[in-house]
From Swiss-Prot:
Keywords: DNA damage, DNA repair, DNA replication, Ligase, Magnesium, Manganese, Metal-binding, NAD, Zinc. This is DNA ligase. NAD(+) binds at residues 32-36, 80-81, 144, 178, 314. It catalyses: NAD(+) + (deoxyribonucleotide)n-3'-hydroxyl + 5'-phospho-(deoxyribonucleotide)m = (deoxyribonucleotide)n+m + AMP + beta-nicotinamide D-nucleotide. Residues 587-664 form the BRCT domain. It holds the Pfam family BRCT. Belongs to the NAD-dependent DNA ligase family. LigA subfamily. DNA ligase that catalyzes the formation of phosphodiester linkages between 5'-phosphoryl and 3'-hydroxyl groups in double-stranded DNA using NAD as a coenzyme and as the energy source for the reaction. It is essential for DNA replication and repair of damaged DNA. PANTHER family: CHROMOSOME TRANSMISSION FIDELITY FACTOR 18, DNA LIGASE.
Length: 664
């Protein structure tokens, strides 16, 4: 029995260390298979001995559903933070601190040091308090609650794999952190969720307030820790020392921690945090600025609600509520009919928002969105805002959104395929034909210079262009009948159409508008199969062998080339003189061949598209995110969080000059 217990202790220590390496350091030292074997061995030993250590990894997810939440009194108070909405308010706070310190130093021989601040991100999640006992074992986790009394969420916190169940510490401490849901976890959860989550914060809060622990685990939460609220061990002299302690205990901690000695430096860091906000895989809603020196904190003291030595700088909201006035149905080039929400105008992120995305009727029903109701709107980057959910209290006088049964443009009957509605009138439905022609003529496709959406509309309405192949039948005399088409413009378009006949195969494949096939996938298909005939006759099994092509994309490609009408149109294009060609490019040996490269920041000699093309021409794979599998990160001016991630993981970083020298 003793041998088995010793073996269990060893396995638990090993598995917890492996989990720390995998989830926190992102640097695993063993394979998943080896981990699983050790985990299974531990499960067997626990069954045999009927003993389970409180910090065993098997205790992270239980089968039971809890009856209710119990209260927990925090050993140390969890304070709220005062807020600054602009730099003027932040400078006022700084000046108050200076005044108190000057007064103290004028009256005391034990002088306080010059003010130094620590700037960190303000995470938009749920504040949690984790208590570790004198043996380093996690014995309690709780919500902030009133700051004095919270709710016990120990079982829920144990589902967060980055939170250690045991730390190497021999005195009681309480550690404060923020439980968050990453964008990656949010998207994965919503793919299979019957009721999709509205936003990341609700996802995290709902998980920790759920009595079904398995549901909490399904949310796949993360956490960052940033404060020791109660400590029976040696006192800290500075916040930097406290943060080092938190990190050394193996608690997950954000890498961004900046020291500042004046407000100019603080402002610069705030601007930087805001600039990388959208690149992060989690939500932040501001920056936190705290006094570093602990004794100075004691002198500054507290108000009834806030510590005077800390403040939060709040960024502009990315979400807001407004009224849904109506729904507009639009037709894409594939014939898919999609809804767009028409909103009561509202300011969000410095922009007046009047429209928002509603993906499909299934999305509308799951989110319970109704006409006249108040909806939660989110805007990320510069993309069209999306409706994330509805304010339940506003539903009383709202009306159901009705799915259309006819095309809003050509009045044809719609057919339902999965969650989407389609107009099958491909020949005379204006939006479909116009968008298909514009896509076919675009720069990355057939590159027909001087072609525009307005030109496509005139070709459809005035020259009766009903298919892509009809483009190659247009005569100059016909173009002269169109608005704003003189002799020169007409001849230029005729020449551009003629010149497009000699095109590379990847551009032709992309121009065809195969569902789910972008330019990269088109390039990958050509690299794999070499000829149009081979691509047309390939199987789903062969298609999934192409990099980044899964079963859904493979089926889209296969079904596309099974359509007799499409094959007929392709044959007509070839008969009209379109000659797609493929020349296997010989790539000379170079340092980037076969390497995975991430680009961040602005480059002097390349646009983002140009550097991507250049790297691919060198045989490199261009990735959008940094991981331990990244070979190089090419850094330009004002790099984002990808640069920090590269430094953290030890990935080779090169600038534009070094890149140019390597390819000479």
């Amino acid at each position: 029995m003793d041998n088995k217990l010793e073996k269990m202790k060893k396995l638990v220590e090993e598995l917890n260390q492996y989990a720390y390496e995998y989830y926190v350091l992102d640097n695993p030292s063993i394979s998943d298979k080896e981990y699983d074997l050790k985990y299974d061995e531990l499960v067997i030993l626990e069954k045999e001995t009927q003993v389970t250590l409180p910090y065993s990894p098997t205790q992270r997810v239980g089968d039971k559903i809890l009856g209710e939440f119990s209260k927990y009194t925090h050993k140390g108070r969890l304070w709220s933070l005062d807020k600054a909405q602009n730099m003027e308010q932040l400078i006022e706070w700084h000046n108050r601190n200076l005044k108190v310190i000057e007064q103290y130093n004028s009256m005391s021989e034990d002088k306080l040091p010059e003010l130094r601040y620590i700037v960190t991100k303000k995470f938009d999640g749920l504040t949690v308090n984790c208590t570790y006992d004198e043996n380093g074992i996690l014995i309690k986790s709780a919500t902030r609650g009133t700051g004095i009394i919270g709710e016990d969420i120990t079982a829920q916190i144990k589902t967060i794999k980055t939170v250690p169940l045991k730390i190497k510490n021999n005195h009681v401490i309480e550690v404060h952190g923020e439980a968050i849901m990453t964008k990656t976890a949010f998207e994965e959860y919503n793919k299979a969720a019957q009721v999709p989550l509205k936003n990341l914060r609700n996802g995290a809060a709902g998980a920790l307030r759920n009595l079904d622990i398995k549901e909490t685990a399904r949310r796949n939460l993360s956490a960052f820790f940033y404060d020791v609220g109660y400590n029976e061990g040696p006192e800290f002299k500075s916040y930097r020392e406290m943060m080092n302690f938190i990190r050394n205990m193996g608690l997950p901690q954000d890498k961004y921690i900046k020291e500042c000695t004046n407000m100019e430096e603080v402002e610069k860091e705030i601007e930087y945090i805001e600039s990388i906000r959208e690149e992060l895989d989690y939500d932040i809603d501001g920056a936190v600025i705290v006094v570093d020196d602990i004794k100075t904190r004691e002198i500054l003291g507290y108000t009834i609600k806030f510590p005077k030595w800390a403040i939060a700088y709040k960024f502009e909201a990315k979400e807001i509520t407004t009224k849904l006035l109506d729904v507009e149905w639009n037709v894409g080039r594939s014939g898919r009919v999609t809804p767009t929400a028409l909103l009561e105008p509202v300011e969000l992120g410095g922009v007046t928002v009047k429209r928002a995305t509603l993906n499909n009727m299934d999305d509308i029903k799951r989110k319970n969105v109704k006409l006249g109701a108040k909806v939660l709107v989110r805007r990320s980057n510069d993309v069209i805002p999306e409706i994330m959910g509805v304010v339940e209290e506003s539903l009383e006088e709202s009306k159901e959104i009705q799915a259309p049964d006819r095309c809003p443009y050509c009045n044809s009957h719609l057919v339902q395929n999965g969650v989407h509605y389609y107009c099958e009138n491909t020949l005379s439905c204006k939006p479909q034909m116009v968008k298909s022609i514009v896509h076919f003529a675009s720069r990355e496709a057939m590159n027909i210079a001087g072609f525009s959406g307005k030109t496509a509309e005139q070709l459809f309405e005035r020259l009766d262009i009903k298919s892509i192949s009809d483009l190659y039948k247009i005569r100059k005399e016909e173009l002269l009948t169109l608005d704003k088409f003189g002799d020169k413009k007409s001849q230029n378009l005729i020449d551009a159409i003629e010149n497009s006949k000699n095109c590379d195969l990847a551009s032709f494949i992309y121009a065809l508008g195969i569902p789910n096939v972008g330019k990269k996938t088109a390039n990958d298909l050509v690299m794999k199969f070499k000829t149009l005939e081979s691509i047309k006759n390939t199987t789903i099994e062969q298609l999934v062998e192409v990099p980044d092509v899964g079963e859904i994309v493979a089926k889209s490609i296969y079904d596309f080339f099974e359509d007799e009408k499409i094959i007929s149109n392709i044959e007509e294009l070839l008969n009209l003189g379109v000659k797609p060609y493929y020349e296997e490019e010989r790539i000379d040996e170079n340092p980037f061949m076969g390497k995975t490269i991430v680009v961040t920041g602005s480059l002097n000699n390349y646009s983002r598209g140009e550097i991507k093309d250049k790297l691919q021409s060198l045989g490199a794979k261009v990735s959008s995110s940094v991981s331990k599998n990244t070979d190089y990160v090419l850094v330009g001016e004002k790099p984002g969080s990808k640069y920090e991630k590269a430094i953290e993981l030890g990935v080779k970083v090169i600038n534009e000059e070094e890149f140019s020298n390597k390819i000479k």
